[in-house]
Structure formats: structure tokens, C-alpha cells
């Protein structure tokens, strides 16, 4: 990709631009090249991208969201029949990165030394579903899972509104997370 050769074209007066580059494969990274008021080129991530590079990098990643094979059709049909006013509702609000991280080691006194490495969405799904059911919760509310630059934050400095954060895996891993929660009745 070369911003001088591959220029986007505007679709009428819609404010929408498009570009086709043959041979792009899933996993390819890309950015938009935009000229500022001084005419200097700047590289920016796709504000509508659905997958981003792992921090500290910030390019958008080509990803096919249609390849995941959902298994929650029965849960979705059952949910449509439910009246939420007829059953108790107990919501567990959780930030995935704060809730659990991988253990680096265990001290002599048995305390864990928690590391900075995250579990992935698939691993978190199993652990969180077990915890939520054990504690009697019926629903979960995730604190921001959109892409954001800083691990120390809860994700409110969003850089990719349509991209689940890559620090826990791919968009397919996130879809698995949701699918698994539904399979557990959550």
C-alpha cells in the first residue's frame, strides 16, 4: 500500500470515500493517510475498523467477521420469549483486565504474584461464567471492551469503537466469549 498510488475516491456528496486494493488478506494491517491543513500526510487508524493491532501499535487489521459459527440460536430464541419483569435480575459489572490476570509465581506464604499478562477472551469466558453462576448472577455488564491504548485504564479512552480490544484476542475470540456466556445461560 502506498498513499501516493492508492488514493481513496469520494462517492458523490455522501462524505463517504472508498478504496479497493486487490490481494488484501485477512490479518493485513492498514491505516488511512490523511493530509492535514499544511498538506502533510498523517497516518490514522480506521475509525470504523473491527480489529486493531496489539498495543503499542495501532494500525487497523483486516478481519472477516462473518466466519464465526455461532451456536447460541436456542438461547436467542428463548431470550426473545422472556419478559425480564417476571424473573429476578442480578447483574455483575466487570472489567476483564482487572478481574483476572495470569499468575507469575506463588510466594512462600502462598500468596500469588499477579503478572501483567492477560488471559484471552476464550479463557476468561470459562472462568467468568463459572464465577458468575456460583455467585448467583444472571447477567454480566462488561466495562469497555473497545480498543484503547492504555492497559492501566478501564478502556474509556477509546481508539476503536467497533473493535473489541486485541489485548484479549481476536474478534472471533470475543464472539466465542459471548457465545459461551449464552451457552451457560448468562
Please give the residue ranges for each predicted region.
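Short clusters of hydrophobic/aromatic residues that line enzyme substrate/ligand-binding pockets
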Residues: 8, 62, 75, 161, ...
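Short amphipathic alpha-helices and their capping/turn segments at secondary-structure boundaries
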Residues: 78-82, 125-136
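Surface-exposed loop/edge segments in extracytoplasmic proteins
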Residues: 1-7, 40-42
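Short loop/turn segments at connectors of secondary-structure elements within structured domains
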Residues: 2, 26-28, 136
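Hydrophobic positions in alpha-helices of CheY-like receiver
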Residues: 177-181
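The feature marks proteins involved in alpha-glucan
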Residues: 11-93, 98-118, 123
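Aromatic-lined carbohydrate-binding/catalytic grooves of carbohydrate-active enzymes
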Residues: 102-119, 130-176
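Loop/turn elements at helix/coil->beta-strand transitions in domains of secreted/extracellular proteins
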Residues: 89, 133-140, 182-186
Amino acid at each position: 500500500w502506498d498513499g501516493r498510488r492508492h488514493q481513496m475516491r469520494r462517492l458523490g456528496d455522501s462524505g463517504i470515500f472508498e478504496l479497493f486494493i486487490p490481494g488484501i488478506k485477512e490479518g493485513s494491517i492498514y491505516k488511512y493517510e490523511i493530509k492535514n491543513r499544511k498538506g502533510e500526510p498523517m497516518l490514522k487508524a480506521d475509525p470504523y475498523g473491527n480489529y486493531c493491532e496489539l498495543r503499542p501499535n495501532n494500525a487497523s487489521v483486516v478481519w472477516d467477521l462473518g466466519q464465526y459459527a455461532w451456536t447460541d440460536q436456542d438461547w436467542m430464541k428463548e431470550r426473545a420469549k422472556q419478559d425480564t419483569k417476571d424473573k429476578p435480575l442480578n447483574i455483575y459489572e466487570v472489567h476483564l483486565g482487572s478481574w483476572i490476570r495470569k499468575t507469575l509465581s506463588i510466594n512462600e506464604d502462598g500468596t500469588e504474584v499477579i503478572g501483567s499478562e492477560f488471559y484471552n477472551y476464550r479463557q476468561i469466558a470459562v472462568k467468568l461464567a463459572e464465577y458468575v453462576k456460583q455467585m448467583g448472577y444472571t447477567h454480566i455488564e462488561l466495562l469497555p471492551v473497545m480498543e484503547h491504548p492504555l492497559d492501566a485504564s478501564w478502556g474509556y479512552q477509546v481508539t476503536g469503537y467497533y473493535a473489541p480490544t486485541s489485548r484479549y484476542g481476536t474478534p472471533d475470540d470475543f464472539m466465542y466469549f459471548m457465545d459461551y456466556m449464552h451457552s451457560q445461560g448468562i
